[in-house]
UniProtKB/Swiss-Prot annotation:
Protein name, per record: 2-isopropylmalate synthase
Oligomer and partners: Homodimer.
Presence of keyword GTP-binding: no
CC terms in the record's Gene Ontology section: cytoplasm
Keyword Transmembrane: no
High-level lineage: Bacteria, Bacillati, Actinomycetota, Actinomycetes, Mycobacteriales
Protein location: Cytoplasm
Region (Regulatory domain): 455-581
Catalytic activity: 3-methyl-2-oxobutanoate + acetyl-CoA + H2O = (2S)-2-isopropylmalate + CoA + H(+)
Keywords recorded for this protein, A-Z: Amino-acid biosynthesis, Branched-chain amino acid biosynthesis, Cytoplasm, Leucine biosynthesis, Magnesium, Metal-binding, Transferase
EC number: 2.3.3.13
Family stated for the protein in its record: Belongs to the alpha-IPM synthase/homocitrate synthase family. LeuA type 2 subfamily.
Amino acid sequence: MPVKRYLPFEVEVEDITLPDRTWPDKKITQAPQWCAVDLRDGNQALIDPMSPERKRRMFELLVKMGFKEIEVGFPSASQTDFDFVREIIEKNMIPDDVTIQVLVQAREHLIRRTFEACEGAKNVIVHFYNSTSILQRDVVFRMNKDQVKTLATDAAELIKTIAQDYPDTNWRWEYSPESYTGTEVEYAKEVVDAVVEVMDPTPENPIIINLPATVEMITPNVYADSIEWMHRNLNRRDSIILSLHPHNDRGTGVAAAELGYMAGADRIEGCLFGNGERTGNVCLVTLALNMLTQGVDPQLDFSDIKHIRRTVEYCNQLRVPERHPYGGDLVFTAFSGSHQDAINKGLDALAAKVKPGASSTEVAWEELRSTEWEVPYLPIDPKDVGRDYEAVIRVNSQSGKGGVAYIMKTDHGLKMPRSMQVEFSAVVQNVTDAEGGEVNSKEMWDIFATEYLDRSAPVEQIALRVENAQTENDDATITAELVVDGENQTVSGRGNGPLAAYANALESLNIDVEIQEYSQHARTSGDDAEAAAYVLAEVNGRMVWGVGIAGSITYASLKAVTSAVNRALDFKHQQLQNGGV
C-alpha cells in the first residue's frame, strides 16, 4: 500500500494536546438539543434527490418524532429548495414549537435570497458558513487567514442588517467554520470569536456555533479534545450553544458525537440512519437509542422504528442495511444456537420477575414492561421500538434458510424478502421433520404453492377492478368480487394506492389488514411476463406473509394480500406453522 502518500493528522493539521482533559470522566445523563438535517445535508447526497412529495413525508416524520429544529433546505442554492421552504411556510405546516433551519454560504446574494425564502415563518435559524481548513484555504479559496475571517464577519454583519427588514420572524443564528476538523483550533477560535462579536448574542438569545467534522480525519478522542478546548476557550461561552456535526468517514461518527457531547457540546446535527455525503452524517437513530439503553430519555419517539425506516427508505430511495443498529432487519436476530438459548432463558427470567414460575409465553408484554430489561445479546427490548420477538426466538427452526432461498430464486424466480425466507424455511423444516429426508426443487415449489398460492378459503378472489385517481396522493378505488366462507360478496374501498384501498374494502368483512412490508419484482420476462409480490400484513392481530403471482404488479400485490388474509384466518394452519412470522 502507498503509505507514504498519507500524512498523520498531527502533521497535516496540528497535534492537539489536552493533558488535563475532563471528558473521559463525564457521563451522558440527558439528551442534547437535536437538529435533523435529512432534508438538506442528507438530501444533497442522494442519487435521486427528494421530490416535493418525499420532502413533505420526511418533514412530517421528523415533526412526528419530536424534532424541534429541522434543517429544511438550502433555499438560495436551488429553486426546488426555495419552493419547498415557501410551501411549508405558506401552508402553515410548521408547528409553533418547531424551528426551521436554512443553510447558506457566506455570500451576499445567497444570504438575501435566503431571507426572501423564509419570509413569514415564525421561527428560523439562519445557518451560515465558510470553510476555514488549511487545505480549503490553500487549494479551494486561495485566501489567507485574515481574508477567510473577513468573509465570515462580513456575512455576519450583512445577516444582522437584513434581518431588520423582517421583524415578524424570530431569527436565530448559527455559524459553522466548515471543515473544522482540518482547521487549527486556535484559528477556529479566532474566527468564531470574531463572528460572535458581530452577532452580539446573550445568554437569553444565544448563537449556535457548529463545529463540524465535515470530513472525519482522526480518532474520536482527538475530536473530543478539540471540542473541550473550544468549550473552555471560546469567548462569551455563556451566550453560545455549542453544536456538533460529525460525519462518518472513518466509521466512528457515533463515537465522535458521544465523546464530543461529553466534552462540552450542547447540540448535535445528523440524519436518520446516517444518510449523507460519502459515508454519511452521524446516525441520529443510533445516537438516540444508545442513550435509551443507558436509561436516558432521548426526547424523540422511536416507538415504531419500522415505520420510521420505511419512510426514510422511501424518501431517500436507499435501503437501510440489515445490520444497521436498531433498525436493520437482522439486528434482533440470533442465528447461533447458544445465543438463542441465552435469549430464551433471559426472556423467561424476565417473565419470572413479574410472575414467579412463569415463562415468557405466559406473561403479556405489557406486564414485562414493568421490569428492568436484562436479556443476553439484546441491548434493548425490540418491542420498545415497535419490533417483535418472533424472529429472535425462532432462530433454531430456521437453519437452511440460505439454501431454501437459493433454490426458490434460481429454480423458481422468486426473490423472497429476508424475513420471509426465514418464515418459509421454517415451513419447509416442518415438512422435513414430519416426513424425513430431503426436499427437492419440485417438492419445495409444491410446498410453497400450497402454503401461499393455492389457498382459496375463507376468501377467494373472483374479480377485482382498480381505479386510480389522478391526484398527487395516488388515491385508488377498488371493487372486489369475492367468495367469503362460501358466499358471494362485493366490497369496495378507497386508499392511498391499491393495497390500502383493498385493505379498506376488507374492513367491511371485519377483516382488519395493516400492511407492514411490501416488495415486488418481475418473475419472468417476455410477452407472458409474470410479477411476484410479497406482503407482510397484520391481519386481525396475526402477522403473516402473503404471496401473489400475476401478469401485473397490481394484481400480484392484491393476490398477496388475499394470501396473507387466508393464512392468518386459517387457525389450523397457524397451529401447524407455530405462530407465523
